[in-house]
UniProtKB/Swiss-Prot annotation:
It comes from Mus musculus (Mouse). The PX domain mediates interaction with membranes enriched in phosphatidylinositol 3-phosphate. This is Sorting nexin-16. The gene is Snx16. Residues 14-26, 52-68 have a biased composition (Polar residues). GO terms for biological process: early endosome to late endosome transport; endosome to lysosome transport; protein targeting to lysosome.
């Protein structure tokens, strides 16, 4: 009697499991949420066979450990000027377990930089999102409104108590109107702010895949990333050129001011040198503000010694030295002159 044929599940090799793991772990810029949803359906189908699931889990852990040991090329937009640099380093331990990441290590609020209407095959709109994991590390991802909607549906299933405000869909109207797209961009920005405001939601797998927190995209992963990379370089170059022109104008202005000050100093030195070489020259007291020049002749400060001697003898007053009188009068005249110059 022939025995009936019963199929026996066989374990899948390490190469196949690693290939599946690599395909599911790396999500592209477009449709990353849809890709992860497809992989979740495949996992539900695999859960029907108990022994096969255990074998696959063990193989995936082995392949994940070998994959995390390899270097990872990351793109960094550093500083306020968004300059670009690259670093090759192995994945960190917390990337293997996203649920173990500290709340302090969560990314800052993603910023939607703008939108663009694509018309290559089918017309659609993509939103350019700037994600900052740390002040030194940031990257750009591109998402459609459909990606936001799918993420919102997933979060409703995972967190029934939370209700995130997502801009509604628009029916029977033009979805590519500029005013409508700007309003939708503001609504999506508020949606992202609510995502990172809650600890559990910000660290869940769906959000991490949506923002590519575990595997940031490189500048050459797709055409969109390459174009964003070039646009960032162009914008940085433009700002640097403007700053350079402003600095050059400031330098020219300072050079002109320095030349004027140097001419003024040279004129003062020439005048001082002239006065020191001519001891009998007149004394000048000038004011630069009003342009007034006061001149005192040496003859004004001289006193006729003979006249003073005769007057003192006629009045029978005590005799005093005419030189002392001249010095006193000269001191009085100079003091009065200095006081008047300060008043003017």
């Amino acid at each position: 009697m022939a025995t009936p044929y019963v199929p026996v599940p066989m374990p899948i090799g390490n190469s196949a499991s690693s290939f599946t793991n690599n395909r599911n772990q790396r999500s592209s810029s477009f449709g990353s949420v849809s890709t992860s949803s497809t992989s979740s359906k495949g996992q539900l189908e695999d859960s029907a066979v108990g022994s096969l699931k255990q074998t696959n889990v063990q193989d995936q852990m082995d392949s994940a450990s070998s994959m995390c040991g390899s270097p990872l090329i990351r793109t960094k937009f550093t500083g306020t000027d968004s300059s670009i640099e690259y670093s090759a380093r192995p994945r960190e331990a917390e990337e293997q377990h996203p649920e173990a990441v500290n709340w302090e290590d969560r990314p800052s609020t993603p910023t939607i930089l703008g939108y663009e209407v694509m018309e290559e095959r089918a017309k659609f709109t993509v939103y350019k999102i700037l994600v900052k994991k740390s002040p030194e590390e940031s990257w750009v991802v591109f998402r459609r409104y459909t990606d936001f909607s799918r993420l919102n549906d997933k979060l409703k299933e995972m967190f029934p108590g939370f209700r995130l405000a997502l801009p509604p869909k628009r029916w029977f109207k033009d979805n590519y109107n500029a005013e409508f797209l700007e309003d939708r961009q503001l609504g999506l920005q508020a949606f992202l702010q609510n995502l990172v405001a809650h600890k559990d939601i910000a660290n869940c797998l769906a959000v991490r895949e949506f923002l590519c927190l575990d595997d940031p995209p490189g500048p050459f992963d797709s055409l969109e990333e390459s174009r964003a990379f070039c646009e960032t370089l162009e914008e940085t170059n433009y700002h640097l050129q403007r700053e350079l022109l402003e600095k050059q104008k400031e330098v020219e202005s300072l050079k002109k001011l320095l030349g004027e000050k140097q001419l003024h100093i040279d004129a003062l030195e020439t005048r001082i040198r002239t006065l020191s070489l001519e001891p009998g020259a007149s004394l000048y007291v000038s004011r630069a503000e009003g342009g007034q020049i006061l001149r005192v002749e040496p003859s004004v400060l001289q006193v006729n010694r003979d006249v003073l001697d005769e007057e003192s003898r006629a009045d029978h007053k005590p005799h005093f030295n005419s030189r002392e009188a001249g010095s006193v009068i000269a001191g009085i005249e100079v003091a009065q002159l200095a006081y008047n110059a300060e008043d003017d």
